Amino acid sequence: MLIKLFGKIFKNSNDRALKVINLIVKKINSLESTIEKLTDQQLSSKTIEFKNRISDGDNLNNILPEAYAVVREASKRIFNMRHFDVQLMGGIVLNRRCIAEMSTGEGKTLTSVLPAYLHSLLGKGVHIVTVNDYLAKRDANNNKPLFEFLGITVGINLPGLNNIEKRNAYLADITYGTNNEYGFDYLRDNMIFNENEKVQRNLYFALVDEVDSILIDESRTPLIISGPIKSNSDIYYKINKLVPNLIKQEKEDSENFQGNGHFTIDEKSKQINMTERGLILVENLLIKNHLMNKNDSLYSSKNISLMHHFISALRAHKLFFKNVDYIVKNNEIIIVDEHTGRTMHGRRWSDGLHQAIEAKEKVNINNENQTLASITFQNYFRLYEKLSGMTGTAYTEAAEFKAIYKLDTIIIPTNRPVIRNDLPDLIYMTEKEKINAIINDIKNCYSKNIPVLVGTISIEKSENISNILKKLRIKHNVLNAKFHELEAEIISQAGCPKSITIATNMAGRGTDIILGGNWKSEFFNKKNINKKRIKKIKESWVKKNNYVIKLGGLHIIGTERHESRRIDNQLRGRSGRQGDPGSSRFYVSMEDNLMRIFASNRIIQTMQKLGMKTGESIEHKWITKAISNAQKKVENRNFDMRKQLLDYDDVANEQRKAIYSQRTEILNSLDIKDIIDNIRKDVLKKIFEKYKTKHSEKINVNLIKIENLIKKYFCIEISILSLYKENKCNLEKLYKNILIIILKKYNEKENKIGSTNLRIFEKNIMIKTLDSFWREHLSSIDYLRQGIHLRGYAQKDPKQEYKRESFIMFENMLYELKIEVITIISNVKIKS
């Protein structure tokens, strides 16, 4: 509903925004002739002038027109590149806490230098966020000469840097890095024991490249720093061997339905559901293989984990596939991002799924991990004071950007009209027929020297097509997660005549495909290059460029429709950049996952009624619309899932912010004596509140309980009954007098140890205990979340129940934390 409503009002609001933006562009253009007359020295000194104006109370919006005019002029002098008006428009949008949708080839990298320079003037730090290390290094090194000419420093934040190198990267005016590295640095900064080890400054402005990929596609996978916990790896191997005994039960409306299966598969949510027959069989198998005692129940607390392992093993075999969801490399399981096709090194599936897949593939099983710190990208990027982003495809997700990140999306017009020919989908009944048609299309283009980019949704499918082309002796390149290192080089040459490139999803995103190939890369990779040689290379490229243009440009082949229209649009957008010609066509079969899982049965029945012959395709508006509706259905479902993830994570996020804030306060404090004093009072007060009673017959019993707890927590021997009588049976007075005794003893300890030593000890204990209890709490709320959906069967709202219970758990954790801190500090022994 939200998405439909958004679509109706989007066009009008976009047009209104562009009218206002155009007025600012005219103002920037009016300054060009004046700025052109400045010497290099005068131009670069404008940065100091702008900073002085800010110090005097001026704001960025007032400075923007002149600042952008200065950057444009600097770009002309340093790069021999002048910002187009549409790039200025993009830069203005990015200053507005918005997302700029800019088509492929429109120069997003050059656009980004405008808001980056403007915000660097505040000296708070600008973070430019890219999807991989290659793009971070490339963009930082490419833009560095321009920024340095204007007196702005540039840092690159890469994995593997030490603390000093990272801190220096963050201290630069503008820092380039990946979303993963920024997020992990934030988590690591909240695990340090010395404030000097912190690398990040306060999070001010993040400019996210390929914003849809980072804030939407990757938002469901949290960043996790974890540590191993002891676990029995043998159990995974043993249960893995039992999986073949179980039979899948078909859906009731299926012609294969017999009702004798052991489990059903929900492909939409990637879940396994056990049938009653299945549960009985699992119980018998576990007993037979001595994994469970004969008289035990599968549902007892000590055996419930066995059922969990069995479900994980079934998911590993039936829902997660090699070269689709993961690859096996160097005896290790590496996850493949379902949206980008890239490998996700260092990421592991949770809940024992990763170990189950390791058992399935017969590789070494790593221990299950305990979460030490975690955060989703949704919550990390919402920590920034100001956030904006750019991408070639944001419109279809505009409602989500607005709902979750409060970011408006503005579509920037192209510098030149898009003349790409987007051909209608060709729909086949079977996968085999579809693949044959795709191969024929490739052969036809190859014979005419037309460059082709073939987009697939998995490594497995890209390699299937590659194997067929090898048999046909058609030269081609394969670009998938297995060949990540060659990604940019392969994709940059995909526009050469006769070039056939097969790529998973949007691998190579961020690198333009130039018709005729990338002539610059030819001399970058060669030694002893001279101007004469460069001229020859460029002349050769011009001929190839003109030749490919005459052929009709780059041809895009989509081997199936993706779950998201946005991913399809990204693939199409690789062709037809900067007014170049191009074409695209998607091939669909009724056996594709999208059609099989999400399309209605009516479509399949209609296709069957048409009586299509083998190899015959159909082009029909109704079918194309049905495919689009299936995609919208999936997009809405995925949006709901991400929104639900955020709703749950927001609960943990509020607790995370409270813990991290307290931790930072302790780290920054030289003396936490006041904090310890307050903890001491709270613990003692809670003891008295717990055993406070008006019944005289219970008072003596309760006083003894108070005495025992005081001895345990505060390491003090007192006769509380005597003190109670001395204080005329007044509990309030008793509390105050005991507090005085506790403080007196602690002060004696301080005199022996020395104040400085005791303060250091208190601080270390406080931080270590806080970290330990927070880790345990993360595990506890994770377990709570995994089972909270069961509350729905009791007519309770799982989300509200999760909020309520996690709050109680958090409150209890904080009190237990106080007890632990005071117990350790009070019980410390002083050695002579």
Swiss-Prot record:
UniProt xrefs under PROSITE patterns: SECA, SECA_MOTOR_DEAD
Superkingdom of the organism of origin: Bacteria
GO MF term list: ATP binding; protein-exporting ATPase activity
Gene Ontology BP terms: intracellular protein transmembrane transport; protein import; protein targeting; protein transport by the Sec complex
Catalytic activities: ATP + H2O + cellular proteinSide 1 = ADP + phosphate + cellular proteinSide 2
Entry keywords, A to Z: ATP-binding, Cell membrane, Cytoplasm, Membrane, Nucleotide-binding, Protein transport, Translocase, Translocation, Transport
Binding-site list for ATP: Q87, G105, E106, G107, K108, T109, D512
Location within or outside the cell: Cell membrane; Cytoplasm
UniProt main location, coarse: membrane
GO annotations of cellular component type: cell envelope Sec protein transport complex; cytosol; plasma membrane
Topological category with respect to the lipid bilayer: Peripheral membrane protein
CDD domains referenced in this protein's UniProt entry, alphabetically: DEXDc_SecA, SF2_C_secA
EC number(s) on file: 7.4.2.8
Family membership: Belongs to the SecA family.
Function, in words: Part of the Sec protein translocase complex. Interacts with the SecYEG preprotein conducting channel. Has a central role in coupling the hydrolysis of ATP to the transfer of proteins into and across the cell membrane, serving as an ATP-driven molecular motor driving the stepwise translocation of polypeptide chains across the membrane.
HAMAP family reported for this sequence: SecA
Subunit structure: Monomer and homodimer. Part of the essential Sec protein translocation apparatus which comprises SecA, SecYEG and auxiliary proteins SecDF-YajC and YidC.
This protein's name: Protein translocase subunit SecA
Lineage summary: Bacteria, Pseudomonadati, Pseudomonadota, Gammaproteobacteria, Enterobacterales
